[in-house]
From Swiss-Prot:
It comes from Alteromonas mediterranea (strain DSM 17117 / CIP 110805 / LMG 28347 / Deep ecotype). Its EC number is 6.3.5.2. The gene is guaA. This is GMP synthase [glutamine-hydrolyzing]. It catalyses: XMP + L-glutamine + ATP + H2O = GMP + L-glutamate + AMP + diphosphate + 2 H(+). Keywords: ATP-binding, Glutamine amidotransferase, GMP biosynthesis, Ligase, Nucleotide-binding, Purine biosynthesis. GO terms for molecular function: ATP binding; GMP synthase activity. Catalyzes the synthesis of GMP from XMP. Pathway: Purine metabolism; GMP biosynthesis; GMP from XMP (L-Gln route): step 1/1.
Amino acid sequence: MTTNIHDQRILILDFGSQYTQLIARRVREIGVYCELWAWDVTEEQIREFNPQGIILSGGPESVTEEGSPRAPDYVFEAGVPVLGVCYGMQTMAHQLGGGVLGSDKREFGYAQVEVIKPSPLLDKIEDAIGDNGAALLDVWMSHGDKVAAIPEGFETIAQTASCPHAAMYNEEKQFYGVQFHPEVTHTRQGMRLLTQFVMDICKCEKLWTAGAIIEDAIERIKEKVGDERVILGLSGGVDSSVTAMLLHRAIGKNLTCVFVDNGLLRLNEADQVMEMFGDHFGLNIIRVDAEGRFLDRLKGIEDPELKRKAIGNEFVRVFDEEASKLENAKWLAQGTIYPDVIESAGSATGKAHVIKSHHNVGGLPEDMELGLVEPLRELFKDEVRKIGLELGLPYDMLYRHPFPGPGLGVRVLGEIKKEYCDLLRRADAIFIEELYAADLYQKVSQAFTVFLPVRSVGVMGDARKYDWVVSLRAVETIDFMTAHWAHLPYDFLGKVSNRIINEIDGISRVVYDISGKPPATIEWE
């Protein structure tokens, strides 16, 4: 590879905003590599990372409070452009000699910003033109404090009626601050603003593309594992599937995939995984039929957390047994992605908020002698999907709705039985089939069916029946942290209900879940 795709890089310092990962995803979309670190990173770490620009995120705290987060002084001494977003702008102003005050009017939600002075950051960006000829921007605000006095050397470049310094910059040092959130879609020109910062102000090149990421990953896999054998637990989910395709392209037959059919998958899913990866793509894949083992292990267990643990532990046991049969295996591959590994490891003081502390290895023995290969470790989910398309995986598979790790184990309420799983599989398949037929599948964020272990009276022909109940669940959400129930058409719901009751012997009633998150969770267990 002639160009190192990591050479052009932006550093994002996290001050605790719920939108921080979104900033990183936007920078990646622009085509530039970036990393997300805790706000209290050391000077040495910044020097070693050697960014071409730094972005300071928003955050929930107040700059005016003692002990609130601050950017390292070196951020403003490194000689690279800096963009402060919301709290990031406030701490920039405070640290460089300006003033920040609590505002008598808190701004949350839509606002219109007036551009009052030209700058490289807001150049040629407008949503409308005001009566005075000034550019107006539709933006998303989320702040209580505001910059009351800008630091020496800065100029105000935008304002709102209640926020006189909605954006500021220091032309000489190329420091910029915006009180709004350019990373969210509600800020209509936010992507253009970030692009102008990353490409025009920081002078980055667009090296971070799907094709380049694949080429880089393949080179690194080859360099790491050489001619040695790699094992991968293939689930058929997005992350493990893309990992499998990357490894297959890099090392071919030296990859062995182990697919564990635990009896908790969707209708025909196990056969589809084998057909796609074994027959179509030619991967070396071992199928383990472990339905009986898993169902035996789950007998008598009703508590959702105990079910999850039982399923996870049994999977590790089955996988370890299969791995031990493979001679000369030196490496274990996993589909760990970037949000899994973002944590407070970069926190020098221990004060930084943990975004997420997680590792995909959970449950593997500590004395495991296999080395670890994680080719997706730097990637966000949307990037994984893009390179999956580039590698030839089908769109419908990459953009399927989320499916929980324990599978139907948490969609059958209470104790798991084969009868319940078989009924649920068929009902869920009808629901999903009808969503596709009505062109509704991609319009909802997640849809599935839940088996309720209660019987209900019904009538079929002239006969009374006393059978099981299922619930349909469909939600709309951006981040899965909050969700609204999807307002699917009544005629559609009626059709799905009629098909399930008429086609599946054993189900007498279908209900629709109209709970939002909060207070309910998306999954029932």
